[in-house]
Structures are given as structure tokens and as C-alpha cells.
Amino acid sequence: MLNAPTYNTVHMITVSKEDYLKAILEAESEGETVISATLAHWLKVSPPAVTMAVRRLKKDGLVRVDADGRVRLAAAGRKIARKLTIRHHLIERMLAEIFGMEWFKVHDEAERLEHAVSPDFEARLLAKLGSGIACPHGNLTEVESPASHRRRGLFLLAQAEPGHDVQVSGIYERDRQLLEFLEQRAIRPGAKVHVAHRNYDQTLTLTTAAGRVSLGVSAAEKVWVKPLDAKLSSKP
């Protein structure tokens, strides 16, 4: 991480604490019950390190810990986490729209830069780029849950039925290898995809701008799509 001061309107806190708060918010949005093991997996740190970090966050009034070990964001912690996701979103857009960086690279760069953004620079980015526009991965500024995606008429590519056309709307952005894998197969935000066949193991055969490609379930479950024909159905 950058050795630079962090900026937020609630607390002056360390980069590490900001990372934990954002990880909790993102894990919650995906429907996970956030416990120490969840955070250890998300942040790739040891369980003892998580225990110490959560203890400090609780002392600072940024999280609550239930009797069963579930970690929840307190109001102050949620405010910081949401602010950080907005900055992350703006930096991703800046890197792609102004500097022309490839969509599958911007997440990692934004992770490094988001902690060093001042309120003034954030305001200038917002004025320059505008609001209400998806990031290069197709995701909205606010962290969305699976339910909120579905309310917008989206469903997972893994649920699309053969014989129909869909358009990629958003992609899970935390896995760089996945993003590069999808880019090689021309599965990117805005791309049109024809679902040709579902194999016995649920692997999908797709037609994209890259030609005929195969996509496993684990990857297809990270891609949100919308229908391109009125009769398109999805599996429950």
C-alpha cells in the first residue's frame, strides 16, 4: 500500500483499517456472514491478524461483534466503507476513461490509490467524470447485493438458458486472473454473448466476439447479464 495519509470525513484511520471496513461491506453485499475466517480469506491474512484488527475496530466504534462472532459495521464504519467504495469507483473510471488503462487492470491500481485521495481531489474527479455511471467492470457506485442486481432485471450468466442472447452487465472485479480469463474470451461489460449449449457438468458453450468458447460454472457465476430477447428465461 502507499505510504500516504488516508482521508475521510469521519476518522483519520490507517490503510489497514480501511481495508477491513471495505472488505466487511463487500462481503455483506454478497450475502456472506462475516466472521474472522471470512475476512482472513478476503484479505489474505492470518486469523490471528484478523482477530487483532477486529478488536481495534471494535474499540474505535467502527464495528460490532455479535456473541456468535459475526462482525457487523457500525454506522461510523459503514460511512467510511461506503466513502472508500465511491473513491475506488471514481479512480477506476479515471484510469480507464482518462488514461486508457484496460478494464481488467484498473481494480488493482484503484486498490493502491484509493487511500491517498483527498476530499478535494475526489470532488474534482466527480466533477470531471460525473456520477451515476458504472465502473469499467459494469458495477454501480453503491455496492450491490445479488437481490439488488435481480431487481434491475439482471441474472447470472450461469443461469442463462441455451439458445438465447445476453449482454454482459457487470463482473466480479476482485479476481484479476478471472478478469483476464474473461477478457481473452471477449466476455467484458457491454459484450453480447450467445448461449449455445449447457453441458452435463453445467459448463457453458458460448459464442462471443472471440468465437466459440467454454466457460465453467465458477466463472459464469461471477458475470451478471441482461436479456437481449423478450422470451429469455433463467433457471430459478
Question: Which residues are covered by each model-predicted region?
Answer:
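Short alpha-helical segments that sit at the start of domains
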Residues: L2-L21
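Key DNA-contact positions within bacterial/archaeal DNA-binding proteins
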Residues: P48, F104
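Basic amphipathic alpha-helical segments that dock to polyanions
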Residues: Y20, V50-D60
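A short, conserved structural fragment
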Residues: K58-D68
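Mid-protein regulatory/catalytic core that forms ligand/cofactor-binding pockets
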Residues: N3-T6, E114-W224
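Basic, amphipathic "hinge/linker" alpha-helix immediately C-terminal to the N-terminal HTH DNA-binding motif
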Residues: G69-H88
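Short acidic, hydrophobic short linear motifs in intrinsically disordered regions
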Residues: E30-A40
